[in-house]
Swiss-Prot record:
InterPro entries found in the cross-reference section: AAA+_ATPase, G_ENGA, GTP-bd, GTPase_Der, KH_dom-like, KH_dom-like_a/b, P-loop_NTPase, Small_GTP-bd
Gene name linked to the record: der
Function per UniProt: GTPase that plays an essential role in the late steps of ribosome biogenesis.
Official protein name in the record: GTPase Der
Organism: Salinispora tropica (strain ATCC BAA-916 / DSM 44818 / JCM 13857 / NBRC 105044 / CNB-440)
Binding site for GTP 2: 205-212, 252-256, 317-320
Length: 467
């Protein structure tokens, strides 16, 4: 959900992005120097990460951290002290704080409740009003009830009710977190630990590539009917098997020959059940017949898995039938036909002879680990900053969009959101994805990257956006 008059969602149509994914909301903590912003950030995130020292200017850049409250997750961005008409280093710090405001869904404006409103605070209020962002006025250092009562004088700033807290002692922090959740757009729910039980694996592929033979190899019994006639299996067949010392729930599915919309009768319903099996699974093993050319239908099945956002292992079955000549041509086919999914884990095996089937369990574990990976927001942005500095976006029309901030919106599969000053070139976005994979892995898992591009500033003032 986007904040009105602030951000417009822009998604590269060439990339596989779940438009329904809810980006992780962002809370920016701003204020003049030494009002306790970093101490408040540590209180909100529940751990001591932001650097705190009783001198102004300790925090220089905007620094993001992951936070959780009442089953919801969001990002908290710590900023340096904001001052009007700042010079040199102080000006750079203030600019970073203003950039944090542009990426935020809600701004916490922190004021020293003991000192009261200052000229700098009043100047900051004018800047915040121009930004058109929702603002929560936080009266920090309200360490006792007497100071808490005095904080009511901050109504004069015109930002509504001041909320007294003591970041140092925790006073009022729970109420402030409740208020933050009320003001934020819908924050994604925290994904609870996966319920204990076998991981679900869908075995998919076109007819007669050996799915049922592989299932029977693991189950040790004729659990699925095997016949040389293509299309023997119609209903998905669940089988609890042990692979590599671990229990797995394998779902064998009907072989797919046509698109669902083109199939009819029994084949149509088998296609629907296969689609349902993929949706119900966590990881899919797509079996290809290594002795035959990679077909258009093979690629459609691979697309079904990636479109569903499932972890992926590609198993080239019937490897016992592959000779040296076929291996040469198969390597060329893989380079040509599977170039859009170089991240998929590939295995060469034979369900009939048992060759290399012991490699399947480790491959499944690697794919699932990547599928569930979460990158801490601070680590993600440290990497992204270095990447953009080393290889900035190319200039188009005399200007180049800037990436201001990034967050991981979810996992299973990993979904990332880039906050930018404008749409990114498709090629540059693919470059970011490639480098993201090089840095953090994600072998065997799709990842999704979307862009939240800031609207152009209107004539009404600095930081104001138009609809």
């Amino acid at each position: 959900m986007n904040e009105p008059n602030s951000w417009v969602e822009w998604v590269d149509p060439e990339l596989d992005v779940d438009e329904a994914a809810v980006p992780q909301p962002v809370v920016a903590v701003v204020g003049r120097p030494n009002v306790g912003k970093s101490t408040l950030v540590n209180r909100l995130i529940g751990r001591r990460q932001a650097v705190v020292e009783d001198v102004p200017g300790v925090t220089r850049d905007r620094v993001p951290y992951d936070a959780q409250w009442n089953g919801r997750q969001f990002a908290v961005v710590d900023t340096g002290g904001w001052e009007p008409d700042a010079k040199d280093r102080a000006a750079a710090i203030a600019a970073q704080a203003e950039s944090a405001i542009t990426t935020a869904d809600v701004v916490l404006f922190v004021v020293d409740a003991v000192v009261g409103a200052t000229d700098v605070d009043e100047a900051a209020v004018k800047m915040l009003r121009r930004s058109a962002k929702p603002v929560i006025l936080v009266a920090n250092k309200a360490d006792n009830s007497s100071i808490e009562m005095e904080a009511s004088a901050l109504w004069s700033l015109g930002l509504g009710e001041p909320y007294p807290v003591s970041a140092l002692h925790g006073r009022g922090s729970g109420e402030l977190l409740d208020l933050i959740l009320d003001r934020l757009p819908e924050a994604p729910k925290i994904v609870e630990d996966r319920p204990r039980g076998p991981r679900r694996v869908a075995l998919v592929g076109r007819p007669n590539v050996g799915k049922s033979s592989l299932l029977n190899r693991f189950s040790g019994e004729i659990r699925a009917v095997v016949d040389a006639v293509a299309g023997t299996t119609v209903d998905p067949v669940d089988s609890l098997v042990e692979i590599g010392g671990e229990a797995w729930q394998l779902v064998d599915t009907a072989g797919l020959r046509k698109r669902v919309g083109q199939a009819s009768g029994t084949e149509y319903y088998a296609s629907l059940r296969t689609t349902s099996a993929i949706e119900a699974a966590e990881v899919a093993v797509v079996l290809l017949d290594a002795s035959e050319v990679i077909s258009e239908q093979d690629q459609r099945i691979l697309s079904m898995v990636t479109d569903a956002g499932r972890a992926l292992v590609i198993a080239f079955n019937k490897w016992d039938l592959v000779d040296a000549d076929r291996r040469y041509y198969l390597d060329r086919e893989i380079e040509r036909e599977l170039r859009r999914i170089p991240w998929a884990i590939r295995l060469n095996l034979s369900a009939r002879t048992g060759r290399a089937v012991d490699k399947l369990a480790p491959a499944l574990r690697r794919a699932l680990a990547s599928w569930e990976t979460r990158v801490p927001t601070a680590q993600l942005n440290a990497w992204l900053t270095a990447l953009v500095q080393a290889t900035p976006h190319p200039v188009r029309g005399g200007r180049a969009p800037k990436i201001l901030f990034a967050t991981q919106a979810g996992a299973a599969p990993p979904r990332f959101v880039l906050f930018t000053t404008g749409p990114l070139d498709a090629g540059y976005q693919r470059f970011v994805e490639r480098k993201l994979r090089e840095e953090f892995g994600f072998e065997g898992s799709p990842i999704e990257i979307s862009v939240r591009a800031r609207k152009k500033l209107g004539p009404g003032g600095r930081g104001k956006a138009h609809g």
